[in-house]
Amino acid sequence: MNCFQEKQFSRENLLKMPFRMVLTGGSGSGKTIYLLSLFSTLVKKYKHIFLFTPVYNPDYDGYIWPNHINFVSSQESLEYNLIRTKSNIEKCIAVAQNHKKSAHFLLIFDDVGDKLSKCNTLIEFLNFGRHLNTSIILLCQTYRHVPILGRANITHFCSFNISISDAENMLRSMPVKGKRKDILNMLNMIQTARSNNRLAIIIEDSVFCEGELRICTDTADKDVIEQKLNIDILVNQYSHMKKNLNAILESKKTKLCNSDQSSSSKNVSS
């Protein structure tokens, strides 16, 4: 008998302790839009947020300071930028400790691909980053991009309409409460029954699940989907670029306006 229950995901639980989250799904499945919906919660604790991505993604405008975005087009550039970021984190922690304060960091890797599975510094962060008050979020199109040597430390597995076989492979190393067979049956049941293609189905590890046999679900926020700017998300993060906040927000508004005009033109022509 499957004793698992479906529950609404509590985003506030992500603030309790460092986490390692994997968001897996195909292109256009809703991974990024859901991640952006988590920001209003995450910035309550994580004041230093860094993004690693191979190409510029305008979706992150207004969510992450430009000087905290690292473009990593090769294995070497990913390794280099991570080593440099780790050094900066260690310096920030030392300064915070001198002032009897704590600093918390979040590293996001968006569609970096198979470079993730070969990155030694990322594996170190997955396995030992808790000691640096660092949490990790990986956005991947397939579980294969999650480093094998770091899968045992994944705390949250977020499925966006992926195959059950892929979910099974991901869960093999992840420490979960209950039988994996029951988890997979429940996952399949929810994916089949819920018509929302962008539904996030979240499996927590044995610590974050709070002793419950549960699978959580969540959806992106309406304001994020409608691209409504929330200035507090940037304001609550540390950056040397805060003095340029107005210019950054104006740039974001201009891009949104141009996008809307382009969409309107297409509708008229069609």
Swiss-Prot record:
Transmembrane segments: none annotated. Signal peptide: none annotated. The keyword Nucleotide-binding applies. One of its GO terms (molecular function) is ATP binding. It holds the Pfam family Pox_A32. InterPro entries: A32L, P-loop_NTPase. Keywords: ATP-binding, Nucleotide-binding. ATP binds at V55, Y56, N57, P58, D59, Y60, D61, G62. Interacts with protein OPG137. Participates in viral DNA packaging and virion morphogenesis. Belongs to the orthopoxvirus OPG160 protein family. This is DNA packaging protein OPG160. It comes from Vaccinia virus (strain Copenhagen) (VACV). The gene is OPG160.
